[in-house]
Structure formats: structure tokens, C-alpha cells
Amino acid sequence: RVHGAANKAGQKKQKMDFHSPDVADSFSHGSIILATKPPEAIGRCAMTEFDKSKLPSRHVSVGPERAPHRSYYYAMGMTEEEIAQPFVGVVSCWNEAAPCNIALMRQAQAAKAGVKSASGTPREFCTITVTDGIAMGHEGMKSSLISREVIADSVELTMRGHCYDAMIGLAGCDKSLPGLMMAMLRLNVPSVFMYGGSIMPGEFKGKDVTVLDVFEAVGQHAAGNMPDEELHELECVACPSAGACGGQFTANTMACVSEAIGLALPNSAGAPAPYESRDAYAEASGKAVMNLIANNIRPRDIVTRKSMENAATVVAATGGSTNGALHLPAMAHEAGIDFDLMQVAEIFKKTPYIADLKPGGQYVAKDMYEAGGVPMLLKTLLEGGYLHGDCLTVTGKTLAENLEEITFNPDQKVIYPVSNPITPTGGVVGLKGSLAPDGAIVKVAGMEKLQFEGTARCFDCEEDAFAAVEREDYKAGDVIIIRYEGPKGGPGMREMLSTTSAIYGQGNGDKVALI
């Protein structure tokens, strides 16, 4: 629904109605039904009269003393009816830093349309994000982890400062996903999370490739195994569309978490960013948040100890990012839940690894979506006894109720049954010992060698380690240790993807260890 520009105050606003895009194709692939209802049905909310006397926005819109505030709203073309409705903050992490975020603005407009259609007044704003793919391998990466806190803080301040009643958060790149979910839990206003979608895979020499292949190609190039022309050809085709990194890196890991934990609509995390069906999910999210206001369902009603355990289970089952072990305790902290690193690791230890996703496996997010998506993954884990089905979600129903009509698709190769997992324990594990008394996290998805002993080779920053790797100044059997790169020491806890990928690119991934 597209609303024309408002006329002068008091005049009736002209409205033009357009049919929503046909999204049926996004729910069926061949004979496999991925969802039992279109997304607009999932988020449907009856037209509701809201009592603003109990909502935060009453402080900026109700009573004669708020006439100056209302004059600002009239200046933006708002009508008396819109001022009298609940105010919903629609926040996106849109920017032009990287493809991860450029589809968010489009989806935010659809979310606003959903809010409007369900008797709400959307108020759009943006916050920052730092894109790891651009920040990686240099001083810029020190900005990444702290950006999570800045995102949460900035959203909190904007929501509180303007007395918004509810929130829809749209995120694309790594730290922005937990940042927005942390803000939702801190504010505890009715909220729906919306992932912006993953990138399409590129194609190089007849094979699907992602940006990780380019990182690894840097190592191959340094070793003299890839000429300049081939490296350039790969970099030009690896990232063909908008969207976040296609493998099960931080963005897709936390997108899966958003569904597992109950803050996102079912199946909304799966469709790639270019798909028009994302707009339908965004519109449904707008309607869903109005339903949450009407029923006073808040993030801390949804995110409980049980739902946090569900989230950790999904991280392990998908061979997800080790960052999940950082973000889940931070989210739990915002909700007042005790859920630390080693408690997360205990769940990792008893969860089967069943999703064959890059970087440890073969497939990307688009493939899992077409195979059955996050709902099929969740149903598989639920039936295996690995999830709590009684957790509330943003649909107003429990996780088990959302999954009632989902069945396992045997004609796909991405998601394995729990009775025949890729490995019996999770793709991410926690360790504790003399080397790391407070605990450590290791991504073991795709690794064959789980024990290593060697000579320590110490570096005091990432740049020194990468330079040594680039000139192959190390040998098989070394344990490469990069010191002073923690949250305080760095500061910022930079991720060592450039160094890790270069080692793999040189063919030495199983010959050295990296700490």
C-alpha cells in the first residue's frame, strides 16, 4: 500500500492501493512445501483500536501540553489519525559500505507498509554498522565488535528519546544482528527482527564460490599457485548480488538464531537478499509487531533460558560462527539471563552437526533455504529432542506450533536427519585447560584432525602474523599464536580471517594450528 503525500492538516489523505507482490513461488520448490502460509498471513493482525494512555508515545502525542510535539508531526505530513496511533520505530543498518546492507532500505519500506496496514505509525531511522568483510585484515577490524555495543546503544537512545512504542529491526552484516537483538531485549518493547538476506553465490570455473574463496585465493597467490589474472577474475565474480556472506559465517548464523530464539517470523531468515519475497516477509513483520503491541508480548517474554538454549543448539547444528559464543551470552545479559561461554559450550557438545554449510561444508544459505530453510532445520532438531518446543515466538504461538505442518524433505542434501548426522557433536566446541583457563572456542566443522601438538610461534599482532604467513615464514607442525588481540588488548578482538584463509589457501590448514 502506497500512501500519497499528506495534504494540509485536517484534509483527508489520499490513498492508492496496490496488490502485494505474489510470493507463492518463494514457498514452494518443486513438490516441497516450505511454509504452510504466505508471510502476510503469518503476521496478520486484525484492525485494532489502541489505547495510547498506556503506551510510551503518549508522552509526545497526547494532551494539550504536547501541542508543540504534534506541530513537528504535522510538519512531516502526519494526520491526526496517525499521531493517535502507536509509533513503531523501523530501524535498519543500511549503508553503502558493502553489499550486506544495501537491500535493507527497500525492505524497511515494506515493513513500514505492514505497520500502516495494521493501524500503526512507522517511524524510520538508521543506525551504524561495520562490515567485517571490508574491515578484515587491518586496523579497521578493531571497530567491529565494539560496533555491536554502539548499535545497541544508539537504537536504545533513539527509541527512548522519541518514545516509540515498538520496534522492527533490519540487519545485514555480522555484528548488526546481535546489536539489534540486544537493543530489543534491553528496551523490552514489542519487537520483531528481520534479516536482510544473504548474497547469491558466485560461479568460478563451474563451481559456486563465496568471498571466503577470495580470501583463500590470496594465500594461493602468495604461494605462487594463482596468477594475477586468475585472482582478478575470481574477485570479479565471487559476490554477484546484494546480501551478507553466503556461508554459515556470523550473519547467517545469527539469522538462524533470530528464528530459533523466536524474535523473527518463521522462514524469514532464509531467502537471499535479491528475492522480492523478502519484501513480503518485511510487510508481515510490520503487521506482526502490531499484533505484539495488541497482546503485550515483549522480547523478554520470548527470550528465556530455554530459547537461548535453542539458539545455541542451532549454532552448533549448522556449524555456525564461533562468534555465536560471544553474542549469545551478550544477548542473555540484556535479558537478565545467566548464560555464559561454557554453558553455551555444553550445549554445543551434545548437539549433532546436521547442516552441510560452508565454510566447513559444501552449501550456502540459498541452498538451505531451497532445501527447506530454517523451519525444516528446527523441526528436525525438535523431533530429535534437541529443542524446547514450548517457547513463545513473535507469531504469538510457540515454536512447536509454528512448525506443526513442516515435514522433512528427503530429496535434498543440505540438512541431515539427526539419526545420521555429519558428526555426532556440534560444529563448534568449547575447550578449557591450562592454555585457556577461562575457556576457548574452536570451529571443528569440516576438520579431520582434532588433536595437535607443536612448537609455539608467537606474534604480537595480526599484521606480523599475516606478513609471516604471506612469505611462508612458518613450517608444518608450528602452532601460530597471535597475542594482544583480545577485546582489551587489541582493543576490539579482531577476527583473524585473513591469516586463517591465507594458511588454508597455501594448503597448510591441517599442518599448523592457529590460536
Q: What are the residue ranges of the model-derived segments?
A:
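Short, Lys/Arg-enriched N-terminal segments with co-localized hydrophobic residues
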Residues: 26, 30-46
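Short hydrophobic alpha-helical segments enriched in small aliphatic residues
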Residues: 4, 20-23, 30
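Catalytic or ion-coupling anion/metal-binding cores of large enzyme and transporter domains
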Residues: 48-96, 100-102, 107-126, 133-134, ...
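Short, charge-rich patches within N-terminal targeting peptides
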Residues: 8-14
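Aromatic/His-enriched, Gly/Pro-containing loop or helix-boundary segments
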Residues: 141-165
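Short hydrophobic targeting helices and cationic amphipathic motifs
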Residues: 18-20, 294
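A short, small-residue-rich loop immediately preceding and capping a beta-strand
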Residues: 158-180, 191-195
